[in-house]
Amino acid sequence: MLRIIATAFAALALGLSAASSGALAAQVSYFAVPKGAHPHDVAPAPDGKVWYTAQHQGALGILDPKTGKTEHIALGPNARPHGVIVGPDRAAWITEGGQNAIARVDPATRAVTLFPLPKEFPDANLNTATFDRKGILWFTGQNGVYGRVDPASGKVEAWKSPKGRGPYGITTTPNGDVWYVSLAGDHIVKIDTVSGDAAMVQPPKPGVGPRRIWSDSKGFLWVSFWHTGEVGRYDPNAKVWRVWALPKSGSGCYAIYVDDRDKVWLTDFTANAIMRFDPASETFESFPSDRRGAAVRQILGRPGELWGAESGTDRLVVVREE
């Protein structure tokens, strides 16, 4: 494990305007995972460990941050997991594209249960998942699919997405609404959680490439704009967008996550950095990787910690507030 102390002064050195009142003194640490794992998504687990998808090794990875040790749980033949989240049952739920199924891993027994997609959707290219307030899992598939799994009954339903290919990130708002973004389709979507119908919302301008989405505590939707290097905020009630450009990046805004204090975390492929955006002061702070080509594709956190997967370096990264 490698630790680096970082502060907002690093952001100032990059020419950013970070307000001193919102500056974050932080410790950045890195944890190596097995070579060739290509960790794609992460999920801080209830027991203090961290789950990650070892995409190129067909496994769910488990990191113990106290010891730095990792464990891999094989998900099945030809597995190629993408996303992982913590379910209401405290289990790991995975979008498992290789087997075209949603996978559940019991953290106690390590048992793997698969929920295959309907045969009408044979190659969804599963991406990301979220749970609604009723305990139903909703998922996206980049080949033009979105759907849901009822863990109680095991029933899996899927629908064709508007405008075909592109569904990517997905989120649940505090009031239980479910939204996803379409990278190739260049729009965001609200799902009717009863009927499964999809209602499209256009971005503030064409060609932004919405990649991931997260809701804050007020129900505002924060969206990473991959093609333009911007972060957008959509107010579903007022139907109004606001947009902020990432400093010095014309493209490459990938992952997004809003923490328990409504601070917005992003990853910037162009700057090879994790970014923190304070909506109150409208300022950015930068936490660049110590290695080239980090390629952090997804981030999640718990109070005081922001975790990401450096798919390009076979490491997990955590930013801890000091």
Region roles according to the model:
Residues 24-35:
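A short helix->beta-strand "capping" segment at the edge of beta-propeller domains
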Residues 32-33, 73-75, 115-118, 159-162, ...:
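Short loop/turn motifs that cap or connect beta-strands within the blades
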Residues 35-46, 76-89, 120-134, 163-175, ...:
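Beta-rich, blade/repeat-based domains predominating
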Residues 51-56, 92-99, 137-143, 179-184, ...:
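Conserved beta-strand positions in repeat-built beta-propeller and related beta-rich domains
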Residues 59-61, 100-104, 145-148, 187-190, ...:
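A short loop-to-beta-strand structural motif that recurs across blades of beta-propeller domains
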Residues 64-68, 106-110, 150-154, 192-196, ...:
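Short loop/turn segments that connect beta-strands within beta-propeller blades
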Residues 293-322:
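Blade-level signature of beta-propeller repeat domains, shared across WD40, Kelch, NHL, RCC1
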